[in-house]
UniProtKB/Swiss-Prot annotation:
Keywords: Calmodulin-binding, Cytoplasm, Cytoskeleton, Golgi apparatus, Phosphoprotein. The gene is Cdk5rap2. Residues 1655-1822 are annotated as: Required for centrosomal attachment, Golgi targeting and CALM1 interaction. Residues 1655-1697 are annotated as: Interaction with CDK5R1. Its main location: cytoplasm. Residues 1688-1822 are annotated as: Interaction with PCNT. This is CDK5 regulatory subunit-associated protein 2.
Amino acid sequence: MDSGMEEEGALPGTLSGCSGLHPVLPSDLDVISDTSGLGNGVLPSMSEEKVSPTRARNMKDFENQITELKKENFNLKLRIYFLEERIQQEFAGPTEHIYKTNIELKVEVESLKRELQEKDQLLVKASKAVESLAERGGSEVQRVKEDARKKVQQVEDLLTKRIHLLEEDVKAAQAELEKAFAGTETEKALRLSLESKLSAMKKMQEGDLEMTLALEEKDRLIEELKLSLKSKEALIQCLKEEKSQMASPDENVSSGELRGLSATLREEKERDAEEWQKERNHFEERIQALQEDLREKEREIATEKKNNLKSYKAIQGLTMALKSKEREVEELDSKIKEVTTDSTKGREDPLKTQIPRFQLREGSEDCEAALVEKEALLAKLHSENVTKSTENHRLLRNVKKVTQELNDLKKEKLRLEQALEEAHQEGNRGARTIHDLRNEVEKLRKEVSEREKAVEKHYKSLPGESKTKFHTQEQVVRSLTGSGSQEDLLLQKSNEKDLEAIQQNCYLMTAEELKFGSDGLITEKCSQQSPDSKLIFSKEKQQSEYEGLTGDLKAEQNIYAHLAKTQDTDSVSNLQAELKEVLALRKQLEQDVLAYRNLQKALQEQLSEIRSREEEPFSFYSDQTSYLSICLEEHNQFQLEHFSQEELKKKVSDLIQLVKDLHTDNQHLKKTIFDLSSVGFQGSDRLELTKQEELVASKEDEDTLKFEADVETPFQSDQHLEQSREIMEDYAEGGCKSGYGRHMDSNILGHDGAQTPGASEEHTLEDELLGLLATLFSKKATPLLESRPDLLKALGALLLERICLAEQGRPGDHLDSKTEKALQQVAVQLRDELGHSFPANSFSKSYNEVKSMWGNWLVKTGDEDTVELKSVSVQTMAIEDTPHGFKPQSKRDAWAEKQEEAIFSTELESEALGEMPGQQATHLSFPSAINPDAEKTGLLIQLKTPELLENLYNLPASPEVVVAQLQGQVLELQRELKEFKTRNKQLHEKLILAEAMMEGLPVPNSALVNVPAAQAVVRTAFQDNPGEQEGPETTQSAGRDKDMDSDQYTSFEIDSEICPPDDLALLPACKENLEDLLGPSSIATYLDSKSQLSVKVSVNGTDQSENINIPDDTEDLKQKIHDLQTELEGYRNIIVQLLKHSQCSEAIITVLCGTEGAQDGLNKPKGHIDEEEMTFSSLHQVRYVKHMKILRPLTPEMIDGKMLESLKQQLVDQEQELQKEQDLNLELFGEIHDLQNKFQDLSPSRYDSLVQSQARELSLQRQQIKDSHGICVIYRQHMSTMIKAFEELLQASDVDSCVAEGFREQLTQCAGLLEQLERLFLHGKSARVEPHPQNELLKGLRTVEGNLPYHHLLPESPEPSASHALSDDEMSEKSFLSRDPKPDSDTEKYPAMASHFPQDLLMEHIQEIRTLRKHLEESIKTNEKLRKQLERQGSETDQGSRNVSACGLALHSSLTSEIHFLRKQNEALSMMLEKGSKDKQKESEKLRESLARKAESLEQLQLEYTSVREENERLQRDIIEKERHNQELTEEVCSSRQELSRVQEEAKSRQQLLSQKDKLLQSLQMELKVYEKLAEEHPRLQQDGSKCPEASDNSFDLFESTQAMAPKSASETPLLSGTDVDSLSCDSTSSATSPTSMPCLVAGHHMWASKSGHHMLGLIEDYDALYKQISWGQTLLAKMDVQTQEALSPTSHKLGPKGSSSVPLSKFLSSMNTAKLVLEKASRLLKLFWRVSVPTNGQCSLHCEQIGEMKAENTKLHKKLFEQEKKLQNTAKLLQQSKHQEKVIFDQLVITHQVLRKARGNLELRPGATRPGASSPSRPGS
């Protein structure tokens, strides 16, 4: 509609208001229509150049124009209205027509003014369009000028640069030519000197020829004499002999002279030939270089020609563009002239038409005012014309300037062409100089060929000199054969000696192989630097040396044979060289023999060292166990999953058989090598040896059963429990024979006994039994218990009954007679058996100690009711309040079954415990590691759940009182804790340092000593006996403890969920207490389960987030995404901190051990691992709590109830810590006592179970790797589902795309990390990737999760022997490195080294270095340990017990002997270290060199890659710019097409409107005629009252006619279409809404207005108002009709009085007046309609003209668009060509520069080569 309005504004205006009054207009107005056609013709001429689809008017312009037009229309209507009223008031009757005509003339004047204003506006628009075109043309010209200037300047710069370069090149060429001329002169001088030398040589050759001729003559004389003397043989034999003797010395002398001369001549000829050849090569190189220079210069000239042509073409294109611009400017000038002529014509025509009119109306003053206004308007137009003409002049000046600039450009072009011609001339000069150089080179070639010919002639003259050599060669060959035979004899003797030595070595090696076969296998697979590996290495070295010697001997024999065969062909020099080789070989043989003897001595020394070392059992057992671990750990570890059950059973049986064989071999070697009597075993230990040999098979079968079960069900905790129970029952049946549960302390009674402090004589039997047990366990007499399983069963049952009775609160006097008898029998048996095995004074341990322990325990149990209550409540909450998916169903079921068993069947539980003596023994034998608090709480939970549930209701009712009491208790407990910590800190540090030094592990940090988790792990890691913590009992307890730990762990996490955020600080304390509560065998499994549970927690958290319904609000979604992002950032920070922490721990280890990169991440201190696990899991908890709070916020009731629970939990934790500190006091004294007695029990029999423990550890490792792989698979699946859910959530709601993308990237990164972890667990080796942050995250995850299966071995199987601990570490390192080499510290420091050379070499080097360093560290640590222990024993003699003082002397002597032995071992190891370190330094240097080379190649490749990538990016940018430009052009074309379609639609709609308005006007004309007739009849009615009946009859007929016409018009109105009515209503909204606003269509802007039209058109508001007026008039007329009928009726005249007739007359007159006013209003409303001609198929000439003009304008616009696109394409092509030209020119210049530099360098090198002392100058960049 906007464009429609614009077109309406452009259409001409005709008469407004007078069309209805004057049906016939004067013929003079025809001229106006013509002028209006001219006015219409102005529009396309203006818009032909300027109107474009992009240059459209704004809505504001349209609105302003509409408002102005409305105001003018309103003012005009008001003026007309008031004028008409004034005229009616002043004049009446005949003068009315004059005033009407006057008003019409004024209206015409106003319309003419408006037309003038419109034309002025059109002129202004045209002038603006011309100005914009001129400006655009000027800007384009300026831009073209600037581009041309830039191009010209660039070309000038390039040409000047090229000229300067060519001048420099010419200068350089001249300098080179001068140097070449100087070189030729020197060569000429050299040639002359050589020619003189040649002439001298020729003279010498002539003398030699004379000598040869003389010799030939002598030979002829001798032959003649021989012929003459043959006839006289008998007579003259003596003379012949003398003559022959005389002739032979002459020949010898002459032959010697000839030889000397020939040798000198030969040397001179060779020198001459070499010099000539050098000269020839030099000239050829120079010729080639000059030819290359010629070619390059020709190429440069060709490229310059091409560039000049291109620039010429570009200049031609610019000139063409300028010409086109000039044409456009000319066209604009012509159009401006046309516009001016049209404007002048437009001014003249209305003046011509108005002159006769004004002549008619000279009498009126208004006409004069109108004329004055017209004159003023003409003056304005004249001034505007003047300004237009000045603008035209300015445009012409601009055109002149453009032509001048074109001329300048042409001049510059000519100048550039001249410069190009000059450059061509210079190129021709250079070509001439090159031609001259070629001629000189050809001359030099000819001279060289002549010299070559002379030399060839000289060589041909010397063919027969080699004949004289044969005589001398024969003599030399004879002498050599003699010497060769002597050397053969010597070689045979040496070979015999070597064979004897080899046989002796073979005998020695066969003997040693039988003894140390297993050690050889270990060295081959583990790559450890042990003495056995040195032996094999020396053997291989000797064999290789002997093979080399035999090869040398064979080579010597072949040389001699070759000499014997080719006596005649070889020369003297070759024979001499061969003699030298023989002498060198002889020397080498002697050196090899000496080296062999030295090696033999070294071998013997090593054998003696090995025999002495075999007396140490620890290293031997470590070798055995490491060999077993290698046998068990195959390369394809995870192929076991694909095996069937039968194959697994076969494999297991094979492994068991192999273990049995190895065990028997080891026993045989022990019996043969070691002397058992020297070690001093007890008889019971020997029995254990034999028993353990018999029980290997049974143990291995049970282990395989457990291994198969683990493989089949890796994730089911219930089946683990059942299997562990079955295994324990099997072990109970077999008895505790394997020595896993020996050495119990008196602290066993600290939690298994139940004697009250008030007990009296009734329990003497039990007291005796307890005293016996205390002495028994303190004296380490468990072999007796091992041989008596029935005793252990009875003891276990009795102790459990005691515990149950004590827990249920029953007194001790309710014992049955059976139990008393059983106690008596056990006491008697123990006394008898202890009397045999121990002396009497060993029972002197005081009973008070035991009693005090019982008392302490009972005091503790009294205080711990609250602890039990709390633990039970925690676990019930864990059962009831677990969220969905938080814990597996199997674990919940297992826990529920445990609770039911604990509540309803305590007797069955006690029986099961009684039937498991192995587990009981393990639990009882670790007072220092298993906290009694943990077991007491576990037993109380199982046995006292009914009582505790009853006691739950006995708490005080008011929470405030409870809170106050709990806070007071907490403060008291904290004070006590501080006191205990200050007391025990020193003891802890001393104990941990001593144990770390004894076990050969790195000392943990002082910061770690204070951490309770680290203390617990260090305590569990160093115990008395290796057998105490091994075996299936420990694994079973680990399985049970794992379930218990996981349940406790989940309960703690639930508490942390329920706690308010203020109490989150309690979480680390809870974790520390929980780790202290665990047993030693379950710490590793706890760590593993903890990491797994942390993973599960996060998984389940995400599950919960998925299960929550998708929120409708996008803000909530964004908030949750933000929270999840913060969580992810927190996890990343945790991983980075863990990585830093692991690096710090590695650095601490290297500082402590004095090595750099020797130990990898596996040798971390346990405290570090525990800290990492604790921080990781606790932070998981905190994050999970946050996540849960985000997903479902807590209610206020829960927050109120949580304060009391948190205080209770704090109290429980403080009490537990206090109890733990009290227990630690007791445990420290027991541990110090055990450490002092440790070396008494060192016997090889204890380490027989190491084979089984290694196998068990390997099976556990594999199982845990499988478990972790399964967890990774589950977590990856979960991540994929989470990504899908996230995508669905994004589709369902509107989220910020940036936030969603970031979250999606993080999720995909997590999924990628999980896939890499899964591959790592499955294949053992991860593909190499470039180092970026994703790989650092993967390393962090590996260090946290992947190292768990290897770290848990040490707390599960700690040993006192340092060497064996080291071997275990090495084995774990070996297994870990074979799977994943990345966590190694060496590979972390040098990742490139690991990628550039093979892994096997690295493994060997690292293992050798580590073993050597570890041996040294071991010896140093043992020395330090023994020294500190001696000092401690000296300082603690008064405080120690009687056993310590009794065993001090024996310990001192054994320690001194061990110290001496270790010092010797240290010296030997230091020597070995020095040797190894030198070799490794050399190898590392070589490796570094190769690394440096490869790094350089990598850098080059990276640089190339960056350059290629930059080029690609640049090309992509260009493509994107071009695409964008194309899109803009297509958008412009589309917009223009849309505008065209819109214009066409508007034209159609206006045609329809016209047709409908014509019909309306016809109906209105008919109605107006009727009203005119009525108006004529009104005065007649007033004048003639007698003619009323006739008038009434006529009026009645008129009314009938109007009533008949009204429905007709009403029926014609609905002919309007819907769209047209809408458009009309839209146009007339303003007039309908406001009472003062007039219709929207402006007077003078009437659609389809024409004086010859047969229709009337107007607004629907005007029509409605007119219709109302007519209807009102009809009602008035009806009333008047009634009144007249009443007045004229005879009845009224008869009946009515005289006064009554006056009333209807007054009414009639008032109604007449109102009718008059109604008619006046109707007449005013009729003036608003105008006369139109509806466009039909035959009558739409004007509209068709307009449509044709629009089409022509559209075609012109299309053409202009096409031309502009062409211009743009041409300019783009020109720009591309210029860029390409610049590139080509720059490349050519670079090439020429390089070529000239090379030429200069070659020319400078040539004269320098002739002088021997001169050094060739090197130019930079050449």
